[in-house]
């Protein structure tokens, strides 16, 4: 398989520190023509941009992930002490870099004990930023469909709902609104019947591939090899 675009990845993760250059070369040699490299807070934005500047097929997305509200080593907590508004304001000039083509990874996560209202306000602020900059979004939605869909209906952003886990019914209106749906390693799991149903009914151009590396691998591939699995997922 050639001409692959990985629509959601984290190659700037520390897990790639030992062999990042080799991994990136392997991607280019393996038919990957594009990668959307996603930041999760201001602390990893520089590493994301460095990758995008070094490798022509890597494009950057900058944003504050909802989990960064509760991670002690994330800049949102470690540097800004939870003041995501100040952090987002400090990140604003970075969006002038032509390597930045999206706002992400942003969204809502109700799986972990994170402040719900702060998440909502942070996500809404970043949807507004994407609207202001006329950029697409890379969206994280974990166990937060109701609030997520409320804001997506309101702001109608372009972009990808990463690691889509919703129903076929919701997929219909999301794609009609112009959102693409991201599918990665989870579609290979034994319980992924809902994903199969969604994939059978959405337009092919709005069902996109992602690795979310190094965090999600298809069965039976070890997580450490997630970056090599796009053909397997497809």
Label for each model-derived stretch:
Residues 59-70:
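A short, structured active-site edge motif that brings together acidic residues
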Residues 227-234:
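Single conserved hydrophobic/aromatic residue that forms the stacking wall/gate
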Residues 28-31:
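Catalytic domains of carbohydrate-active enzymes, especially glycoside hydrolases
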Residues 178-192:
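His/Asp/Glu-enriched short active-site or ligand-binding loop at hydrolase and phosphoryl-transfer sites
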Residues 36, 59-61, 138, 160-162, ...:
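Structural detector of well-ordered beta-strand residues that form the stable sheet scaffold
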Residues 69-81:
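Surface-exposed, active-site-proximal loop segments in enzymatic domains
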Residues 2-4, 9-22, 34-44, 50, ...:
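Divalent metal-binding pocket/active-site signature
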Residues 61-63, 101-106, 206-213:
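Non-cysteine beta-strand/loop elements that form the S-adenosyl-L-methionine
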């Amino acid at each position: 398989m050639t001409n692959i675009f990985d629509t959601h990845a984290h190659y700037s993760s520390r897990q790639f520190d030992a062999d990042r250059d080799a991994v990136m070369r392997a991607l280019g040699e393996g038919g990957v023509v594009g990668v959307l490299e996603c930041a999760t807070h201001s602390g990893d934005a520089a590493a994301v941009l460095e990758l995008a500047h070094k490798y022509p097929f890597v494009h950057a997305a900058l944003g504050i992930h909802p989990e960064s509200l509760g991670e002690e080593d994330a800049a949102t907590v470690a540097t800004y002490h939870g003041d995501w508004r100040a952090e987002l304001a400090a990140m604003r000039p970075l969006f002038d870099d032509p390597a930045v083509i999206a706002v992400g990874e942003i969204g809502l996560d109700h799986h972990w004990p994170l402040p719900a209202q702060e998440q909502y306000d942070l996500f809404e602020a970043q949807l507004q930023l994407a609207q202001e900059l006329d950029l697409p979004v890379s969206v994280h939605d974990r166990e937060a469909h109701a609030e997520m869909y409320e804001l997506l209906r309101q702001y109608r952003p372009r972009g990808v709902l990463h690691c889509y886990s919703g129903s076929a019914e919701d997929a219909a209106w999301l794609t009609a609104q112009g959102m693409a749906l991201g599918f990665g390693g989870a579609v290979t799991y034994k319980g992924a019947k809902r994903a199969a149903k969604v994939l059978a009914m959405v337009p092919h151009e709005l069902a996109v591939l992602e690795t979310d590396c190094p965090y999600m691998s298809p069965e039976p591939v070890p997580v450490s090899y997630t970056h090599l699995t796009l053909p397997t997922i497809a």
